[in-house]
A protein has these predicted regions:
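Alpha-helical interface subdomain recognition
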Residues: 1-84, 107, 120, 219-373
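N-terminal glycine-rich flavin-associated loop
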Residues: 86-108
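A generic structural signal for well-ordered coil/turn residues at beta-strand boundaries
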Residues: 97, 120-122, 152-154, 166, ...
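A generic local secondary-structure boundary/capping motif
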Residues: 113-114, 132, 144-148, 157-161, ...
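A short, Trp-centered hydrophobic/proline-enriched beta-strand micro-motif
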Residues: 119-129, 158
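Cytochrome P450 C-terminal beta-domain/meander region
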Residues: 130-141
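A short core secondary-structure module
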Residues: 143-179
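Flexible, small-/acidic-enriched active-site or ligand-binding loops
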Residues: 146-147, 173-208
Length: 373
């Protein structure tokens, strides 16, 4: 019986993705290669995953060429990509950009862009330019950083705020005059990041995708960001699996270290944190929330911020439990710690995320107390 809220077809997808990514991972060798390249992207693997396996369209509606498996489908995929730290633009293109386009684009633009996403024919980097870009005389100026997967994007989708406080969504070619994309090495070498600068870039040089109000746009962003919770669950599961395997093999004082009570307790704490994060992630994707956008927004806030904190704690504990080997470059555990640290701050910090949730439900919060600090 599949765990709530998944059905058998979701578990079939999980097994297919898990098998494919296991081959890609190659026992951790691929992560070392991707990290050494410095761009956090494996083009050949992405083409195979998106096109041959059909995973790019997992959550996109069938009318646009996708599989129509919604939030649950992408939760399954995100969890498995997190387990292997798959270096590809699944989140930026197939989750974040796809959600924005589905929510606010015209029907013609949906048919065009969502079908290209579903077929794996386009990579889109969706950027929030509010507070970062200035818009005067229909010219954009400023810099957005970090810009996830912008280095490899075929389309830069930018949200800006006009004088009427509307959110305007515009798509630009990376070759647009005045637009520059500069890759940089972030804390996480398995995820591609860049700075995208706008120097008098005209709105008319891009394709207007849609327009909406700030509240609707913010909710859409947070619901998309909630998918990162599944990635954190996958990464946390990998850290726990590696730790349990090591504790059952490492011998100290004449016995396996996993037999010591202090080690057992630490592993139990890691498991509890992981399962709590998993529950939050699955609830945020539950069909029970369909039709209630506010509930989806709140569930996504809880999931993303709790799961990212849990992943960070689990990854840190895993390194400590591995002793000296946990600090070596050759052992892949540090990549998971870096992804956990990156996810914790990506888009919004956990502190800001919990404060946003407190404001949403009308609660005066102490975010340090909420986060157990």
């Amino acid at each position: 019986m599949p765990p709530f809220p998944f059905q058998e077809d979701h578990e079939m997808i999980r097994e297919a993705v898990k098998g494919w990514l296991s081959d890609w991972e190659d026992g951790g060798k691929t992560l070392h290669r991707v990290a050494k390249d410095g761009y956090g992207f494996d083009r050949a693997a992405w083409d195979g995953f998106a096109r041959d396996q059909g995973m790019a369209g997992i959550s996109i509606a069938e009318q646009y060429g996708g599989a129509g498996m919604g939030l649950l489908g992408r939760t399954v995929v995100m969890e498995e990509t997190g387990y292997t730290l798959f270096s590809a633009p699944f989140f930026s293109t197939c989750v974040l950009a796809a959600d924005i386009i589905e929510a606010f684009a015209s029907e013609d633009d949906k048919a065009d862009l969502l079908s290209k996403i579903a077929s794996g024919d386009i990579i889109i980097s969706a950027l929030d330019g509010r507070g970062k870009l200035s818009l005067e005389d229909n010219k954009l100026n400023g810099t957005i950083s970090p810009a996830t997967d912008a280095v490899h994007a075929d389309l830069i989708l930018v949200a800006t705020q006009n004088k009427d406080n509307d959110i305007v969504l515009t798509g630009y070619s990376p070759n647009t005059a005045g637009l520059s994309v500069m890759p940089y090495a972030s804390i996480d070498p398995t995820r591609s990041q860049a700075k995208v600068s706008f120097d008098n870039v005209s709105l008319s040089d891009g394709q207007t995708i849609g327009k909406t109000d700030e509240n609707a746009f913010s909710q859409t962003l947070q619901i998309a960001h909630g998918a990162l919770a599944a990635e954190c669950v996958g990464g946390g599961q990998k850290c726990l699996d590696m730790t349990l395997d090591y504790a059952n093999q490492r011998v100290q004082f004449g016995r396996q270290i996993g037999s010591f009570q202090s080690v057992k307790h630490k592993c139990a704490d890691m498991f509890i944190a992981l399962e709590s994060a998993r529950s939050a992630s699955y609830f945020a994707a539950s069909p029970d929330l369909d039709g209630d956008r506010t509930a989806k927004f709140e569930a996504a806030l809880i999931a993303k911020n709790y799961a990212s904190e849990a992943f960070f704690k689990i990854a840190g504990d895993a390194i400590q439990m591995h002793g000296g080997i946990g600090f070596t470059w050759e052992y892949p555990l540090h990549y998971f710690f870096k992804r956990a640290r990156s996810n914790r701050a990506l888009f919004t910090s956990s502190e800001d995320g919990f404060q946003m949730l407190a404001d949403q439900i009308g609660l005066k919060s102490n975010t340090s107390a909420i986060m157990g600090k």
